[in-house]
Amino acid sequence: MKEGKRKKTLTGCKQTSTSKIMLFSMILTAMSASIVYAADTNVADEPKVSHTITVTATRTMEDIIKTPSAVSVVTDKDIETRRVDTVTDALQMLPGVYKSQKANGGLQIRGFDSTDTLVLLNGVPMNNTFNNGVDWEAIPVHSIERIELVRGPSSSLYGGRGVAGVINIQTKQQQPKQSVKDIHWHGQIGYGSHGTLNNELGFDAQVSNRITVGMSGEQRKTDGYPGFFITGRAANIRPSTVTVTPDNPVPQTKDGSYLLGSRGDKSFNNKNLSAYVTMKLRDRESLTYSYLYTKNRYAYENPMSTITVNGAPIFSGNVKINNQKYVALRTSRYLGYDGLKEYHAHNLQYKNDKNKLQVTFNILDRKKDGFSSPNNPNTPNYSGPGDDSFYPGKTINFDAQKVWDRMGKHSVVAGINWKKESFEQKRRELTNWRNHSSFDSTTYPGGLYEINKGAT
């Protein structure tokens, strides 16, 4: 749905804004206390988590039974056993998690949207800088070792974004072994209806006593399957209302609304490339660099209407329900968004397990992020003017923490976090809303009529 335009003259000069956020937290945890595990994790369909070690709830390695939070874990074995192909499908196995059938991969946790949840991938915050959303398709599901979900506010440990909880995703990384050189290949080829592909190939290799490397490539795509169904409420017919009579009664849903059709086939093409190298420095001390590249294109095509007149589907007009009621159709409701995303994520992590010290520095660079939408479409195959909203952004994050766990009955965690975020949104007029490069310069140079920026 198109936002209201704020037409203005642009000078092209770039604004800058810089500030810094620092978070310091110290937690005292009574290790000998008897903790009651939250009831909503005792669900029969949930993966077994008894005696599982978690690090997300308290930022320390702790038995999940002793954790004072509602925590659930999904492992790579759960993903393989249940043939899960997306991160959202993996999380949907857990209680309190709902996957939206409308949004592309949208999640709700205890009623909160994913924009209220902090998502970490190997320590890299994956929430975007524009609206705090998460692009789940950017995460290579077949490289995942485990997913930890902590429900409830976690601001004291992770900052203000963890209102609904924290999702911590760890990918598989082989650890160096003594005088062992080996290589492990993994992969899969999947094909399904609607031109669906799910392919993955990768390896982990021990190249020396101190160094291991790994790389994985993944592609998931589909030509589309019906999604985002459209409904409407009936209104009273007035003397001035012009209506058409459908060939058949309009389908009605249980809530009394009428099923008008759908946006059509929800297609996407997602490609991921990930790599890492780990160097063993000393005993129980290591340095790891990891990289993730992802590119995704998504769109709705071939919209469908449940209403026909004289055998032809219609997408606009007032459709007569009976002598007193009608339902209005608007072509714009049948056309979805056309989106494009491209990210680079870099992560450098130092771990000293002996002294329980961890330092992480990462960058999430969203080179491309945005979508286009049509302006006043009059046919379902409309390829005329539209709007493009493009909002790339960057997150730079530094995190360090130290744990002291031999202090009587208590454990002390001290840490510091520094984060810098920025984004720049550009809105342009397009001659063809499906073509992100078809800038309409009739009114504004390059079609650019609005710029919004933000930084923290």
Residue ranges and their predicted role:
Residues 1-82, 89-94, 279-283, 310, ...:
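N-terminal Sec signal peptide and the immediately downstream disordered periplasmic leader
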Residues 56, 88-125, 145:
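Extracytoplasmic beta-strand/coil segments of soluble accessory domains associated
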Residues 87-90, 105-108, 135-140, 149, ...:
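N-terminal periplasmic accessory domains that precede
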Residues 125-153:
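Short acidic/polar hinge/loop motifs at secondary-structure boundaries
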Residues 131, 184-189, 198, 258-263, ...:
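Extracellular loop and loop/strand-boundary signature of outer-membrane beta-barrel proteins
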Residues 191-222, 231-301, 340-353, 406:
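Transmembrane beta-barrel wall of Gram-negative outer-membrane proteins
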Residues 222, 264-270, 284-349, 363-394:
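Flexible loop and strand-edge segments within Gram-negative outer membrane beta-barrel domains
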Residues 337-341, 383-456:
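Outer-membrane beta-barrel transmembrane domain signature of Gram-negative proteins
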